[in-house]
A protein has these predicted regions:
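Glycine-rich, flexible loop/turn motifs
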Residues: 2, 39-42, 54, 84, ...
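A small-molecule sensor/coupling module
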Residues: 63-66, 82-111
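Short, flexible helix/strand-to-coil boundary loops that buttress conserved ligand/catalytic motifs
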Residues: 34-36, 56, 80, 88-91
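Short proline/glycine- and basic residue-enriched helix-capping loop/turn segments at helix->loop/beta transitions
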Residues: 1-10
Length: 111
């Protein structure tokens, strides 16, 4: 997949969005934020070598829980949602079940 250079302030995805692309951060930093009761909460930082944006597709959620915003100039590899879906579908059903049903895992991601 091609790498894209992203400038500070670029929004990769928005809370409530229904797109499901994932992202690999090669260089730089992205912050995840969430609007709760009218105020924005942030503090989850994703840096080089880390992935983000895959939980919406992995857990078959209707919408994204966070907004992902580039915090410093970054090189990022976007992974299309359909590629993620295809890879998940080709995975061992037991592993898929374990990940999707990990006790309270989804709650910890959004809580």
């Amino acid at each position: 997949f091609p790498t894209e250079t992203m400038e500070v302030g670029t929004v990769l995805f928005e809370q409530g969005g229904t797109d499901g692309d994932g992202f690999i951060v090669q260089v730089g930093k992205v912050v995840l934020s969430r609007k709760v009761c009218g105020s924005v909460q942030s503090g989850i930082f994703v840096g080089a070598g880390e992935i983000l944006g895959v939980y919406k597709t992995l857990f078959e959620n209707d919408a994204r829980y966070f907004t992902g915003t580039v915090l410093e100039k970054s090189r990022i590899i976007p992974i299309p949602e359909q590629v993620l879906k295809d890879r998940i579908a080709a995975s061992d059903p037991f592993i898929i079940y374990c990940v999707r049903n990990w006790p309270n895992f989804g709650d910890r991601l959004i809580g």
